[in-house]
């Protein structure tokens, strides 16, 4: 399996843009992604999201590193995390909750299914 490399992740042009699946409120955030899905249950990429509140529904484990922006994530079973550029997270499988993006965020990520 070849090595996956994303060059200049802070300015990389992202391929796909769609409104978030479950918005909460009138301002609907738009998520943009460039990613590679491998056949071993791993996806990696660069993801960006505009301001807004929405429900996270991804059930995979995720490691991510925030390149820019500011937001909070409130897991269904935990306390609010305040996240900004330079922070990294490792979310266990089934980490459901509410994203609140205050300033457009961009992150690199790895999903493990």
Go through the PLM ranges and name each one.
Residues 1-41:
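A short, N-terminal "cap"/entry segment at the start of jelly-roll beta-barrel domains
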Residues 3, 44-46, 63, 88-90:
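Conserved hydrophobic/aromatic beta-strand scaffold that supports enzyme active sites
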Residues 38-58, 92-93:
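Conserved short histidine dyad/triad with adjacent acidic residue
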Residues 45-46, 54-59, 75, 81-82, ...:
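Short histidine-centered beta-strand/loop micro-motifs
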Residues 49, 58-73:
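Short, conserved beta-strand element in jelly-roll/cupin
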Residues 50, 79, 95, 104-105:
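A generic "binding-loop/recognition-motif" signal
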Residues 78-94:
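Short acidic-glycine-tyrosine-enriched beta hairpin
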Residues 90, 97, 103-113:
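A short hydrophobic beta-strand segment most commonly corresponding to one strand
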């Amino acid at each position: 399996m070849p090595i996956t490399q994303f060059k200049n992740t802070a300015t990389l042009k992202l391929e796909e843009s769609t409104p978030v699946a479950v918005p909460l409120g009138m301002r609907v955030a738009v998520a943009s992604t460039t990613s590679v899905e491998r056949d071993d249950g791993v996806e990696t990429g660069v993801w960006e999201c505009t301001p807004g509140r929405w429900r996270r529904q991804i059930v995979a484990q995720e490691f991510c590193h925030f390149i820019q922006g500011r937001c909070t994530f409130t897991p269904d079973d935990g306390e609010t995390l305040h996240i900004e550029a330079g922070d990294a997270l490792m979310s266990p499988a089934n980490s459901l909750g509410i994203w609140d993006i205050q300033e457009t965020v961009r992150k690199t990520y790895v999903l493990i299914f």
